[in-house]
Structure formats: C-alpha cells, structure tokens
C-alpha cells in the first residue's frame, strides 16, 4: 500500500482525526480508470459486462491535482485493463509532476516497446502484472485468450529492460484458485527469469463460485506440498520477505478455516480498527467514490467526482459515517480483506491503544 515511514503521518493529528471521525489525508488512492478488458478471465466479470463511459482524462487530472493538495502520496491505477485508455502515460506524467508516486496493475498484453518506455519515462514507479501460472496452457485457460502468456511475459521483460530510465519495481500478481494451484511451484523461477522484483499470491474470491474456490482439501495440499516450495525458492530469489506471503489462505487450522470462508483478515478486525477511511480512497471508472475495493459496489458510493469535488466527498457526511463504524469495523466486507492489515498494525502501534 504505502510505506508508513515515508508518508509523513503526523501522529497527534491522525489520532485526533480518528477519535473524532474527521478526515485525515487520502495518502493512497486507487483510480479505476476503465471497466472493460481485452482478456476473458474465468474469475472476472469485467469482460462479460458493458458499463457506462468512464470519467474523462481532464476530470481525472483535476482530481489528481486536488489529491495532491490534500496530501496524497501514492496513486494506483487499475481497471479493468487500464492500458485500453491511451491517456495513461499522460495521467502518470501529470500525477508525477504533482509529487505523487504512481503504480499500476495491468495484464501486460497491450505493452510493447514504445508503451513500456513511455510509461517508465512518464514516471511509473511500480507495475503489477498478472500471471496465473508459469505454465502457458494453464495461464491461457484461465485468461481465456490464446497467445496471452507470450505477450504478458514479454511485458515483464520489457519493463525490466527500461527500468533504468526510472525507479520502477515490477511484481507479478497470481490469483490462486482450484484451477491453477497445483501448477505454481515454479512460479518464483519464472518471475526471476523475467526480471521481476517480487510475487503476490492472491486468494481467489469466493464470489467466483465453487468451480474456482479452494476446498479444504485443496488448501491442505497447497499448504503441505506447494506453498513450502514456493516460500523457500521465492525467499532465496528475493521475491518475498516472509513465508507468510506464500500462504494466501493462512497456515494455522484457524486461519485456514477463516480463509476457506473468505475471511482473509483472519479475525484481526474482531478487535482492531481499520484506518482506511482516514488514509485511503477508491475512485471508480464512472466517478463513484468508495473507501476501498472491498466496499466497491457492495454499498452505496460515498459520492461522485463528476458532480462534486473529491474534497467535499472526503470531508463529507458519508465518509464520516463510515469512519464511525471502524472501532472495530462493523462492515462485513472488512472481515474479508487482507489488503490493509500490515499497515493497520503499524498505525495501531503508532497511535494506539486509545
């Protein structure tokens, strides 16, 4: 998410904001700039649905300038597939000029030499590229398009080639599901071969249905035979820091029980707050604003940047209402989230208990 030591968090100011449910700073903001996608991933609905047109680049620029004034340190661009919008290098350049670090998630299939160079020269600081198996046929079965493995792996190599033009980190995202988990043992070797800096193993969402969801016996097999090999190899290659990163469904019996139910916070929020409503926001392709991806379309939007300034929404009654429900979180979606736990722990250690 963001490096706590580099955010310039004012301890007392944040504590008072938390205690009074006031706005702090949107330190980290996700921009979902496009809904559609050029792949047909079996665990995703973006390619199955047609939505309204996205917010214009000019409006996104105005919001980025506003975010800079409010103290945003990092913007993460995603979709759908963000590279279906030709203005992405322009948006990255604009945000970088306003002192904001920019990262992006992409499937990589639309990245060629020119686009890779443009993105790095525009100031892109991090890119997560989706690879769902080191085995070509499995990756393309999941992604639904033949030839996608070659173009995606090439994108990783291209970013590695041009990274000297900026300060770019390259990571591989892998959704672990019933379909692919038995093929992932050599994922660290592929990542290293392509020049990636790290891997992120992401547990499949339970909304993907029984065909993809991991049964208890699947998790047991993964944890006993595959995850240990991934952990050992990935740590040796410098792709992960701790063994925990190789166990997206948890390691202990209790964690596995909760993970099987999709509760990837593993009970943390039963007794601790989530600080995302004070430090984070998500702006959807259509301008709707949510606290995070877990609340996106699971609850009404907090506002829309098409007809209101982001500042009005950030400091408004709807955001305040969410902040009042965070001690501990009363939202069911929070129990299913593992995105913020590490940072929430660090913030809790900094300003709590209270």
PLM features: residue spans?
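Amphipathic alpha-helical recognition patches that constitute DNA-binding helices
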Residues: 28, 32, 171, 186, ...
């Amino acid at each position: 998410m963001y490096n706590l030591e580099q955010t310039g968090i004012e301890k007392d100011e944040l504590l008072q904001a938390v205690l009074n449910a006031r706005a702090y700073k949107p330190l980290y903001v996700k921009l979902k700039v496009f809904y559609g996608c050029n792949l047909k991933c079996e665990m995703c609905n973006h390619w199955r649905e047609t939505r309204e047109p996205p917010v214009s680049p000019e409006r996104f620029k105005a919001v980025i300038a506003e975010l800079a004034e409010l103290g945003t340190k990092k913007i993460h661009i995603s979709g759908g597939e963000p590279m279906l919008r030709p203005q992405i290098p322009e948006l990255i350049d604009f945000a970088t000029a306003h002192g904001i670090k920019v990262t992006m998630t992409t499937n990589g299939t639309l990245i060629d030499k020119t686009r890779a160079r443009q993105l790095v020269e525009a100031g892109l600081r991090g890119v997560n590229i989706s690879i769902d198996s080191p085995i070509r046929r499995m990756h393309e079965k999941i992604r639904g398009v033949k030839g996608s493995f070659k173009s995606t792996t090439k994108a990783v190599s291209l970013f590695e080639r041009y990274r000297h033009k900026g300060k770019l980190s390259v990571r591989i995202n892998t959704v672990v599901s019933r379909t692919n988990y038995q093929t992932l043992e050599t994922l660290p070797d592929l990542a290293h071969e392509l020049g990636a800096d790290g891997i992120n193993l992401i547990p499949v969402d339970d909304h993907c249905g029984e065909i993809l969801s991991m049964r208890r016996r699947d998790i047991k097999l993964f944890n006993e035979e595959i995850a240990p090999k991934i952990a050992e190899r990935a740590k040796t290659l410098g792709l992960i820091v701790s063994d925990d990163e190789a166990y997206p469904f948890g390691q202990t019996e209790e964690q596995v029980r909760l993970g099987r139910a999709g509760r990837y916070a593993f009970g943390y929020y039963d007794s601790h707050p989530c600080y995302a409503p004070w430090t984070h926001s998500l702006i959807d392709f259509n301008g709707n604003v949510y606290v995070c991806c877990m609340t996106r379309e699971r609850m009404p939007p907090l506002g829309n940047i098409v007809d209101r300034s982001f500042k009005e929404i950030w400091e408004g009654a709807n955001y305040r209402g969410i902040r009042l429900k965070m001690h501990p979180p009363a939202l069911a979606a929070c129990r299913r989230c593992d995105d913020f736990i590490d940072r929430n722990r660090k913030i809790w250690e900094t300003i709590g208990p209270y």
